[in-house]
Amino acid sequence: MNLKNTIKKDIQDALIKIAIINCDPVITLNKKTKIGHYQLNNLIKIANISNLKPFELANRIILNIKKKYMYKEITFSQPGFINFLINPYWISEQLEKIFLSPRLGINHVNAQNIVIDYSSPNIAKEMHIGHLRSTIIGDVMARILDFLGHNVIRANHIGDWGTQFGMLIAYLEVKKLVNSPLSLMKLEEYYCKAKKKYDIDQLFAEKSREYVVKLQNGDQYCYSIWKKLVSITMLENCKIYKRLHVTLKKKHTMGESIYNKMLPNIIEDLKNKKIAIEKNGSTIVFLKEFKNRLGEPMGVVIQKKDKGFLYSTTDIACLKYRYQVLHADRIIYYTDSRQHQHLLQAWTIAKKALYISQNLLLEHHIFGMMLSKDKRPFKTRDGDTIKLSALLDEATERAMRLIKNKQPNLSKKKLNQLSNIIGVGAVKYADLSKNRNTNYIFDWNEMLSFEGNTAPYIQYAYTRIVSILKKSNMPIKKLKEKIFLTKESEINLAIKILEFEEIILLISQKGTPHILCKYLYHLATSFSHFYENCSILFPKKIKTCKSRLKLSILTAKTLKKGLNMLGIRVVKKM
């Protein structure tokens, strides 16, 4: 049930009846719930457009919709608001439908093919905290769009091609390590040494470039080593994905190497279409849409003098593939803000070349950085980048210490399980609860707190409801009486449950998981107020008990579904 959209449509229909069209009513939750659960916020603006006084326009709108069953009362308040108090009986009817629905009453939408480009680690390097935001924010979007019925194509655009592989293959050859057992940790060490050697040893650099050319030309020996490096890396990355409880699998890997064979044809095609030109041995696209420091069209190099290709070339090919082969209707990129201009340029070139439709939805969902308390990039004490595995290890250890203090008699197996769920969940929620467009301060104490907008607080709210339901000893099949709402805290909780669909739909458009975190926190606090003000297990009447149990079940289901969409697990006891 999308209450905001329902109210908005009622207002639009009322405006059409009084000959006011092309207006966009802004509906918000009302903080003063005694006069209205929702309110029209831009009445004054609409009144100015229609040359009516706000009070006069409000009366006309109210007159046209006040008889609808879903509204208990519609009122005007100064200086220019319309307040909508929802009928408790109507709310109860909607809750009954949701109670019987395995999808919490949320319908499927018209399906699109949506490619989500996220995570994207590099080969021969361990994942670090810089990969966290892209991985978990992108995964929330994938889960939500999946739930709504879209065909979601997860694209883990790994960096599995380029000069670094020539360096690494050459180094493994020189050190006679090709047939040795290799771990990802060792590969990263060898890569760092290979890079240093490449910068100071001209012969080694030439050998590295030779291997790059051989690899690009399909040399079987180089290809077999490359494949081994990719396999070792992705095996470890998939372990991280499993620990993070994200839905990325090995089958979702779509590395840069996929598009390698397309690149020569794209260069020729762009030259034939007069989009690209050769200058000083390089192939360049000059874009008037972008200006350099001198105010001239910016040049985008798509092939170097040595005939090597660049990231821009790969991204143009990638766009073509996703549109023409995967038939994407919408492509969403989860990379940091530094990639924004680069992506815009690739999109512009692909459109000029007619590789993609002008109507293809292209979105770059940028995100900020994770900072330490001193507001600097979050690193180890030695100044090194923190490995993602180390971060998750510490989260689990910290959660374990907290749980031991609260439940010292837990079995080792249960302790490990709980520590993992709560620790990893806390890290994810701390990130997801922040607006992705901003940087945020990483704080262990805050994220593992059982108070405030944190994963442990939401998880605990769920376990408390599970405990209440267990104490009731009332099977769900016996809860046949209708939900009825009399107290304000019951109605406010019910309204909050009904809000879930509009939150999910909003995130599906904006890609902003912090909105869902905020909603779940408010849902949990609404339940807490309900619990404090309404006896659930021991009211005067049995039908009141059953009604409140159903309301509790709906709250638990919504909390669980919301956390699931965030990729965070629940527990039945904490």
Swiss-Prot record:
Q: Where in the cell is it found?
A: Cytoplasm
What's the EC number here? 6.1.1.19
Subunit text:
Monomer.
Among Pfam families, the record links this protein to:
Arg_tRNA_synt_N (PF03485), DALR_1 (PF05746), tRNA-synt_1d (PF00750)
Family annotation (SUPFAM superfamilies): Anticodon-binding domain of a subclass of class I aminoacyl-tRNA synthetases, Arginyl-tRNA synthetase (ArgRS), N-terminal 'additional' domain, Nucleotidylyl transferase
Family matches, as SMART domains: Arg_tRNA_synt_N, DALR_1
**Keyword Nucleotide-binding listed:** yes
Give the record's family classification.
Belongs to the class-I aminoacyl-tRNA synthetase family.
| Protein source organism | Buchnera aphidicola subsp. Acyrthosiphon pisum (strain Tuc7)
Per UniProt, the keywords (alphabetical) are: Aminoacyl-tRNA synthetase, ATP-binding, Cytoplasm, Ligase, Nucleotide-binding, Protein biosynthesis
Q: Which InterPro entries match?
A: aa-tRNA-synth_I_CS, Arg-tRNA-ligase, Arg-tRNA-synth_N, Arg-tRNA-synth_N_sf, ArgRS_core, DALR_anticod-bd, Rossmann-like_a/b/a_fold, tRNAsynth_Ia_anticodon-bd
Entry superkingdom: Bacteria
UniProt entry tagged with the keyword Metal-binding: no
Give me the gene this protein comes from: argS
Catalytic function, reaction form: tRNA(Arg) + L-arginine + ATP = L-arginyl-tRNA(Arg) + AMP + diphosphate
Any idea what this protein is called? Arginine--tRNA ligase
CDD domains for this protein: Anticodon_Ia_Arg, ArgRS_core
Gene Ontology molecular function, alphabetical: arginine-tRNA ligase activity; ATP binding
Listed under GO biological process in this entry are:
arginyl-tRNA aminoacylation
One GO cellular component from the entry?
cytoplasm
Q: Which PROSITE patterns match?
A: AA_TRNA_LIGASE_I
| Residues spanned by motif 'HIGH' region | 121-131
